[in-house]
Amino acid sequence: MDGMTGDFRFGVNMVVPDSRAAWVEKCRKAEDLGYDVLSAADHLGMAPPFPALVLAGEVTSRVKLNTFVLNTPFYNPVLLARDVTGTDQFTDGRLELGLGAGYVKEEFEAAGMPFPSARERVDHLERTITELKRLYADPEHKPAPVRAGGPPLLLAGRGDRSLTLAAAHADIIGFTGTAKTPDGAAPAPASAEEIEERVEFVRAKLGGREAEFNLLCHFVNITDDRAGALAELAKLTRGVLSADQLAEVPTALIGSPAAVAEQLHAHRERFGLTYYTVLEHNMDQFAPVLEHLR
């Protein structure tokens, strides 16, 4: 699944705006900047991901189109299969399906749905994967997926069961790479050792099966003052990790474009990470890094 940047792929997790024109402009810009994947999140209060991705497919020619990630408990698996394969058809096979177990209790309440336990949410995710595979393989199911077996599947998670499920079924395994600050007020990077432990857990479960490793990078700062930026991030994240520890974590891509490119190569060697997703507000400042990897 190599992209324009050779051994790596880079995606942007987009916020879908209120107007069609603004969304079209954003999508074209992401592709022009050299990103490989354009992602739409799935949260109440935001535009629905499937129509957004169909429109993105109409106004771009190269980027893959990804749901990052669906709140799977909101979906009936049979109805979801229809939306997935229909979107796959309308985007000429550029869809990547990202699924998660769901975690925002307030969204379930807003939808008038009970908030299931973690076990129940992962149970539903597993049932959904099984049902999607069954329907993809059914020659009577319409619309049919563009490729046999359906679009590439991304499963994201942090816990043992979610990552075991990902190791068994996913083409792309998404690592969250975050922890909570002591007061719970802000996301903070998990330590390099914590991420490495999760990666090794997945590798053991894969048993030699190939899968692409994805990481959502919350912390991007393209700057010539790396030491200062790391010190500032340590303060912002309430000292969960020191500046020296932050210098090693793959979720904090900080430094000049050339320095960040070197970090990405080092993280690939240590963690096997080859597919990174940045948040939309970092899309412009991260783009020069792509130039160093072409």
List the model feature ranges, each with a label.
Residues 1-294:
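Active-site-adjacent structural elements that line small-molecule/cofactor binding pockets in enzymes
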